[in-house]
């Protein structure tokens, strides 16, 4: 089972994935029959304007790769649920790629680190099974441990081509004449394509090959590959690269020691960090306990405050009622005070008493006058009737 390169960013895995798709002749066997353009690295690490279409195209590519491994998967469409597409893809890949650390929601986006690592893992599985004929290193920088022979690095003529597995169909150089390809045997052919119909693994178009040459030419500082290798066998460069690789392999010892020292230093730093983390965790535990006590105290005070607020509300209501009653009593008291201070009735009584006193005096005078008149009148004679 292949472990996906989840630690690498998508932009790095995408470049490796495009190269592996070329080795699998993806453009010829998958893109052209389905009227699709060739895959570029940006298709895997950049978000497109339609994420669902991007997910569907990537899923279909994975299905084609799985079909190369003899695994049949149900097709997908733009109307399927993205989570369902991601889940089905992970289930189909679980026997060849370790998908334990790849969640479906990281696949449903249609791009990113996890999806690129998954597709790259499937491509690695295809290459491991199909084993295409490519130039590969059998023991890069090794010291011929199997042979037990120590070769002199200063001898430029030493035969070291046995460190390479070379497919003769892929060994060849371009001549200065456009459209001519020279094989290792020195035979010039009229076309850049080999018997398999490919210029290089995954390339069947001469225009694409020229674009590759221009890209490599710009990376090599403007050297024209066609002019340099015209009519020449580039195995000498492979030999030089092999010598350079062996020279570099000797430096790996010191590098390994430096790396070992760095690992030791990193280990010590990690131990310090772990100790500091434990100390901080203990402090966090103490402060967490204090925070819990403070929260409980705050909760109790909050409850008391709520009860006091209710009591204050009740007392405020009672106070309002008492104020209303006091206001009514004050109004009644003012009315009674006004009524008690009113002297109009007393004035009427006094006036009545004064008028009665005058009438009494008049009556007394009249009575006196009447008595006087009575006493002044002579009594009548007997037997005299006064009519």
Curated annotation (Swiss-Prot):
A single GO BP term for this record reads: intraciliary transport involved in cilium assembly
| Superkingdom of origin | Eukaryota
Has the keyword Amino-acid biosynthesis been applied to this entry?
A: no
Location of this chain's protein in the cell? Cell projection, Cilium, Flagellum; Cytoplasm, Cytoskeleton, Flagellum axoneme; Cytoplasm, Cytoskeleton, Flagellum basal body
Q: Which family does this protein fall into?
A: Belongs to the IFT57 family.
Instruction: Name a GO CC annotation attached to this entry.
Output: ciliary basal body
Alphabetical list of InterPro entries matching this protein: Intra-flagellar_transport_57
Protein task: Component of the intraflagellar transport complex B (IFT-B) involved in flagellar assembly.
Keywords associated with the record: Cell projection, Cilium, Cilium biogenesis/degradation, Cytoplasm, Cytoskeleton, Flagellum
Where is this chain primarily localised?
Answer: other
The cross-references to Pfam families, in alphabetical order and at most eight, read: IFT57 (PF10498)
Q: What is this protein called?
A: Intraflagellar transport protein 57
């Amino acid at each position: 089972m292949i472990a996906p390169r989840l630690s690498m960013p998508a932009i790095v895995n995408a470049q490796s994935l495009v190269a592996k798709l070329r080795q699998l002749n993806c453009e010829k066997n998958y893109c052209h029959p389905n009227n699709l353009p060739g895959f570029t690295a940006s298709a895997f690490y950049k978000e497109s304007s339609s994420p669902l279409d991007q997910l569907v195209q990537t899923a279909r590519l994975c299905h084609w790769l799985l079909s190369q491994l003899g695994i049949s998967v149900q097709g997908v469409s733009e109307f399927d649920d993205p989570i369902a597409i991601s889940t089905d893809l992970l289930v189909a890949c679980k026997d060849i790629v370790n998908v334990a650390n790849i969640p479906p929601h990281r696949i449903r986006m249609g791009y990113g680190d996890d999806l690129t690592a998954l597709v790259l893992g499937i491509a690695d599985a295809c290459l491991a099974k199909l084993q295409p004929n490519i130039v590969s290193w059998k023991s890069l920088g090794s010291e011929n441990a199997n042979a037990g022979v120590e070769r002199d690095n200063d001898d430029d003529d030493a035969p070291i081509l046995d460190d390479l597995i070379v497919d003769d169909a892929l060994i060849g150089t371009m001549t200065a004449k456009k459209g001519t390809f020279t094989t290792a045997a020195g035979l010039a052919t009229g076309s850049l394509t080999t018997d398999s119909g490919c210029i290089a693994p995954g390339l069947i178009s001469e225009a694409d090959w020229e674009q590759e040459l221009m890209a490599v030419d710009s990376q090599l500082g403007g050297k024209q590959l066609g002019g340099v290798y015209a009519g020449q066998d580039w195995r000498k460069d492979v030999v030089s690269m092999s010598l350079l690789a062996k020279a570099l392999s000797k430096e790996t010892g010191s590098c390994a020691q430096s790396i070992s020292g760095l690992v030791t230093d990193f280990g010590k730093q990690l131990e310090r960090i772990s100790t500091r983390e434990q100390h901080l965790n203990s402090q966090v535990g103490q402060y967490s306990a204090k925070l819990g006590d403070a929260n409980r105290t705050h909760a109790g005070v909050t409850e008391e405050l709520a009860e006091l607020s209710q009591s204050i509300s009740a007392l405020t209501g009672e106070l309002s009622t008492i104020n209303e009653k006091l206001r009514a009593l004050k109004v009644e008291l003012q009315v009674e005070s006004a009524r008690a201070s009113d002297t109009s009735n007393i004035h009427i009584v006094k006036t009545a008493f004064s008028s009665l006193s005058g009438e009494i005096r008049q009556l007394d005078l009249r009575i006196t006058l009447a008595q006087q008149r009575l006493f002044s009148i002579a009594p009548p004679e007997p037997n005299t009737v006064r009519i």
